[in-house]
Swiss-Prot record:
General function of this protein: Phosphatase required for histidine production. Also acts on L-galactose 1-phosphate (L-Gal 1-P), D-myoinositol 3-phosphate (D-Ins 3-P) and D-myoinositol 1-phosphate (D-Ins 1-P).
Identification of the protein by name: Bifunctional phosphatase IMPL2, chloroplastic
Record's catalysed reaction(s): a myo-inositol phosphate + H2O = myo-inositol + phosphate; L-histidinol phosphate + H2O = L-histidinol + phosphate; beta-L-galactose 1-phosphate + H2O = L-galactose + phosphate
Source organism per UniProt: Arabidopsis thaliana (Mouse-ear cress)
Keywords: Amino-acid biosynthesis, Chloroplast, Histidine biosynthesis, Hydrolase, Magnesium, Metal-binding, Plastid, Transit peptide
């Protein structure tokens, strides 16, 4: 995955799918996902031609040593009505992305390697464009940062920024394994206030909003407690993605847990939020790989930070520099602290 837009050796025609209009201006619009009893529709349009420069950005972080209190997490400037509206748009984005992804899953299509040799497909590109079109039509003052095309905003910064990863786990998508997902985050003044993990093949959608309990297909969920590392189930996508130094740190945790597991991409975090695993530890993630996970994990009662225990914020600007980050997510603050102590990352 890349932190900024790149040119591909092959071009695709990007035409978002046609669908009914999203009633985004109506505050009473329900926030249920398409996988519960009510389906959200979304605005359709052809791909919008917006000049995209190679923008870069950075992350800053704030320390956190306590389990998040979901009753006090919403920014005071943001009303419940606004948050509900943004959640409705987020669900519409996931619907649009999922419609594209299901069209191409386990089908034959061209695969292009990016500059870092990570793969991209027409499904990645079309899914991102479908989401971008909805945001531009419903929330034109918001900025967008997508994995495939980077920063999209006429301004150099914005209070609201949507961070999109149309297919987190493209290799799993290519090989027909449904553990990939669409990641959608909304940041307000640098803080993730809304996050969605959508698995369009299994039709599972996790949505987290600061100040509210995380839901899976409309039902409240929560993480589980684990008293010590020796009883923990741990996920990471692949140990081959770690640098030598990071792999040594990871191995100190791996050697203490009950069961180390591999290969789930963003789905591992969804399983953690639902109370099926205890830890997820990964290295070298870009902002679009994990910002959507923050409200989902925290709203389910878990903790997610970098390897030093600092919480994630994104201070967006057109001239910021992108870097990679190490992420540890846990079902509760106790097992999270034990993982940090074992990582010994300074």
């Amino acid at each position: 995955m890349l932190a900024q837009s790149h040119f591909f050796s092959k071009s695709f025609d990007l035409i978002p799918p046609q669908s009914p209009a999203l009633r985004s201006a109506n505050p009473s619009l329900r926030i249920s996902s398409s996988y519960s009893n009510s389906r959200l529709s979304f605005l359709s349009s052809s791909a919008i031609a917006v000049p995209v420069s190679r923008r870069r950005f950075c992350l800053t972080m704030a320390s956190n040593s306590k389990r998040p209190n979901i009753s006090n997490e919403s920014p005071s400037e943001l009303s419940d009505t606004e948050l509900d509206r943004f959640a409705a748009v987020g669900n519409a984005l996931a619907d649009a992305s999922g419609e594209v992804i299901r069209k191409y899953f386990r089908k034959k299509f061209d695969i292009v390697d990016k500059d870092d040799m990570s793969p991209v497909t027409i499904a990645d590109q079309m899914a991102e464009e479908a989401m971008v079109s909805i945001i531009f039509q419903n929330l034109p003052s918001h900025a967008i940062y997508g994995e495939e095309k980077g920063w999209r905003c006429k301004e150099e910064s914005a209070d609201y920024v949507w961070v999109l990863d149309p297919i987190d786990g493209t290799k799993s998508f290519i090989t027909g394994k449904p553990v990939f997902g669409t990641l959608i985050a909304l940041l307000y003044k640098g803080k993730p206030i809304l996050g969605l993990i959508d698995q369009p093949i299994l039709k599972e959608r996790w949505i987290g909003m600061n100040g509210r309990r995380t839901k899976l297909n409309g039902e409240d969920i929560s993480t589980r407690s684990c008293p010590k590392l020796s009883q923990a189930y741990l996920y990471t996508t692949s140990p081959h993605l770690f640098s030598e130094e990071a792999e040594k740190a990871y191995s100190r945790v791996r050697d203490k847990v009950k069961v180390p597991l591999y290969g789930c991409d963003c789905y591992a975090y969804a399983l953690l939020a639902s109370g099926f695993v205890d830890l997820v530890i990964e290295s070298g993630l870009k902002p679009y790989d994990f910002l959507a996970l923050v409200p989902v994990i925290e709203g389910a009662g878990g903790t997610i930070t970098d390897w030093t225990g600092k919480r994630f914020l994104w201070e967006a600007s057109s001239s910021a520099v992108a870097t990679s980050f190490n992420v540890v997510a846990a079902g509760d603050s106790d097992i999270h602290q034990q993982a940090l102590e074992s990582l010994e990352w300074h």
